Each structure stands twice: as structure tokens, then as C-alpha cells.
Amino acid sequence: VTVVLSKAGWVRSAKGHEIDPNSLSYRGDDSLQDFARGKSNQLAVFLDSNGKAYSIPSHSLPSARGMGEPITGRLSADSGVKFVSASVGVDDDRFLIMNTGGYGYIAEYKNMISNKKSGRAFMRLPENAEMLKAIPVRKNHTHIAAVSNIGKLLIFEIDELPILGKGKGNKIINIPKDKLAAGEEFMAHAQLLATDS
């Protein structure tokens, strides 16, 4: 299945892996936020902007033939949070977990799962920071390239980040607190680099 999360927090699931999530129709000015490919018997894990992790069985999500449904109907999230990330995997699959404040760590899928509707505290965020999308880590990934909104680029070995069940993580890129608070500087994105890329 392909699990699709929209920017407005609507969720749905399409059969197979061939579907292009960008080609689906979205409500009004809503658009794609994130998607994940997996199996229908796996749990889909969603991260919100406050650093909480939630799980929903993939097979129970509404069909992508329609617009889906608001994820908040399935979960009891704090008011005003955005859902930023969708992931599907098996126990020891690894994901790069990061926030706009410049911190990150590697998490195993089994530690991202929550059996509570209210989710579980997963990443401790610096003040004024928000979660970024979780990025699947493959066996051949060796380096992380992190980029700030003002174009700072840092490339380092993936082994430099700890593997954690939850927590704050390590500083990936230096973001001054005052600039983060003012919205002037933040970690915008990271890319994983492989030995054969």
C-alpha cells in the first residue's frame, strides 16, 4: 500500500506502490505533505509538529479513490498541531528523525509505534522548533547532507548520529536560538547520501 498524508492532515491509503501521490486530487488548496510505501498489515506511523508519534493500521485507512479523512478523527492530538510525516516499516527499519532547531537522531521503526490514540512523546524539541519529515535510512546510506533555509550545508557521516528510542538527539547544524524564534533561520531539509550515488 501507499499511505498518503496531505498538508491539511488528511490521510488515505492506495493499493500498490505504483501510484504517484502528487497525481491524486486534493481538497481546495490542500496538497501532498508526505507518503510512505509498505504492506497493508503494517502500522503507519505519523509524526506531528510537536514531536509526538502516532500509529494507525494501514489497512484501516480510507481508500485513495476518495479524498481520505482528517487524521485527527482517528487520533487525539493537541489542538493546532500539524502532521508532518508518514512512515511504514518493519521492526528494525531505521529513520532519520530531525527538527527545524537543527537536532536529529536515528530511530528504529519499532520505537516509533504508539498504541495510544494520544500518541507518545518521541522527539524533545528545542523551543520554537518543529518536527521535519522522517527519512527512511537504507543500508547503503553513509552520509547526511543537512541544509538550512539560508543555504548553510553540512555533510557528515550517518554514524555520527546516535540511535535512540526517543529524546532530543544531537546537534546536526547550528541554528541560533534567537534566529529560530524569529523564523529567520532553521534547518529546512536533509538528504541521505549513498556510497553508490
List each language-model region with its residue ranges.
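Short, structured "edge-of-domain" segments at secondary-structure transitions
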Residues: 1-197
